Amino acid sequence: MSPSSAASASPWRTLLPVFAACAAIGLQAGVALPLVPLALEREGFDKLTIGIVTATWGIGMLAFGTRIPRLASRFGAVPVMVIAVFAGLLINVAYTVTSGPIAWGLLTFLHGLVGGVPWVVSEIWMNTVVEESKRGRVMAVYGIMVAGGMALGPAVLQVVGVYGPAPFLTCAALSLLVAVPLLPHWHTAPRIRIDGGSNYVSVVWLAPLAMFAAFAGGLGEQVAFSFLPVYAVGAGVSAETGALWLSVFVMGNIVLQWPIGWMADHFDRRAVLAGCALVSMVLVGVLPLVPATSLFVIGTVLLWGGISFAIYPVGLALLGQSVKSGDIARANTAFSMIYILGGLIGRPMTGAAMDLFREPGLGGTLALFYCALGLTALLVWRRKGA
């Protein structure tokens, strides 16, 4: 199916399989993301080491990311996604027979090589078929599906535990759920085309604000998923409660993503982006002031999760708006890689800040980047609106 023919069908119907796959990806991620940080924390490794190990996923994705559009163009969207999912299944099993930061750093790197494939290809799929007037809401539904899966992940950990082989084997089994909705569309998924006249540098400069949103949003989300459970333990609650904080963080996305997506379709997306970034800055700034055992921390984490999560889909909508006549495949890949780069820089930076300043190091690091994005978006909005 070509992009034009895909677009002629109902965009929502065309996107159903990728939405379902993204929900499964979110579920698997919600189970997997806390495992390595909590295991290394239990073994006594410092937070800088934890940040470096978890950052190797991003290194793997960056090392392989530029090849994803070409592979999807040559072999098809669904085949490359399914092969990557099964490779990830084997890597999850390998965690159960290894231990320590060196072995897990290598496995996390390999996971990054294959883990970025279904994510990047699914976003190219969406931006290929979506209508401009619905772009914000489509990206909101995408965010809700991923977040819904992620919110269930820590609940799964309450059943299987956060330590030992059981949670990793659970992740391996959940990989199969990603492939199931894609297989019927092996030959009918939208065809991904590559513009031979463009390159990654040129597509970045087509939408610099969107790319900055990817960086800041990626830094915030990946730092939260790596360090929010660790922050919670340091603040005086159990590891299981810390994992549930992640559920609350992601639940905010489910609650707030659709109204923010609606705003992105009806108001200037640069203004919406600025609002999300600046409110997120305030929320992470007050988090250390909220007692970890009070109900107020739930509300703070919920709002922070929902509003900060919106930075990514609003940025993705800005991207599609800016490069709709250009190379959307390369632009989407660059967007995802810059998102990963944000986490690659932010995780060790936040780990070091938390080693130096304890729990306030988390909010201070994130507030700095949220502030930079918010002010930049405001300046661009005011300048282009003048």
Model-identified regions with their sequence ranges:
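C-terminal transmembrane helical hairpin of 12-TM major facilitator-type secondary transporters
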Residues: 270-313
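A late C-terminal transmembrane helix in Major Facilitator Superfamily
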Residues: 326-356
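Helix-loop boundary and gating motifs at the non-cytosolic
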Residues: 9-58, 221-231, 235, 242
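Intracellular juxtamembrane helix-capping segments at the cytosolic ends
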Residues: 117-130, 309-323
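Helix-to-loop junctions at the C-terminal end of transmembrane segments
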Residues: 64-76, 161, 256-268, 354-355
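Structural signature of the two symmetry-related core transmembrane helices
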Residues: 79-93, 271-285, 367
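C-terminal membrane-cytosol helix-exit motif in multi-pass small-molecule transporters
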Residues: 172-192, 376-380
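Cytoplasmic helix-loop-helix junction between adjacent transmembrane helices
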Residues: 109-144
